[in-house]
Amino acid sequence: YNAYKRMKFNQLQFDQIHRGYIQGLDFSMYASHNYSWQQMHQIRLGLYDKVDVSIYLDNSISAEEMKEIRLQLLKSRKVE
């Protein structure tokens, strides 16, 4: 975690890393300058919800698309 503090993320990005750390999530999956803070947010929420974030772990997918995928994964899990 301390190494990520030195990696010059903007405040909004680092906030998502910090929240993942506090929640006990594997924030290393999204702690990359390649992701916007909004994308990091959707990945963090997916990890928290225990959905397969690898499906949308791609910085070319917009945060809004990530949200749609995450919600669909949540919905399909509840149907099973």
Where are these regions (language model features)?
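General marker for long, soluble alpha-helical cores
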Residues: 1-80
